[in-house]
From Swiss-Prot:
PANTHER family: 10 KDA HEAT SHOCK PROTEIN, CO-CHAPERONIN GROES
GO biological process: chaperone cofactor-dependent protein refolding
Subunit structure: Heptamer of 7 subunits arranged in a ring. Interacts with the chaperonin GroEL.
Protein name per Swiss-Prot or TrEMBL: Co-chaperonin GroES
Gene name linked to the record: groES
Cystines in this chain: none
Length: 93
């Protein structure tokens, strides 16, 4: 499993399928955001005086992330998205 460093977060993006006339269209290239589940989080970032500030998200959170943010990485057969916490727009409740 991937263990992110600093303020980075590993996400599993939810693929949404659209059907048009019985055909499945994978993904939505026009969307500005996508929904993902937080799989792993880094330890946080250090302030100038050395204090560790934890991230605002935790494993299992469902989040809204910018569509073109981060780097896609593979761990075995699974594909994940590695993003900075700043690219996460909101926690979906």
């Amino acid at each position: 499993m991937l263990k992110p460093l600093g303020d980075r977060v590993v996400l599993k993006v939810e693929e949404k399928e659209q059907k048009v006339g019985g055909f499945v269209i994978a993904g939505n290239g026009q969307a500005a955001t996508k929904t993902a589940e937080v799989v792993a989080v880094g330890q946080g970032i250090r302030t100038l005086n050395g204090e560790l500030v934890a991230l605002s998200v935790k494993e299992g959170d469902k989040v809204l992330v910018e569509n073109h943010a981060g780097v896609e990485v593979k761990d075995g057969e699974e594909a994940y998205l590695l993003v900075s916490e700043a690219n996460i727009l909101a926690v979906v409740e």
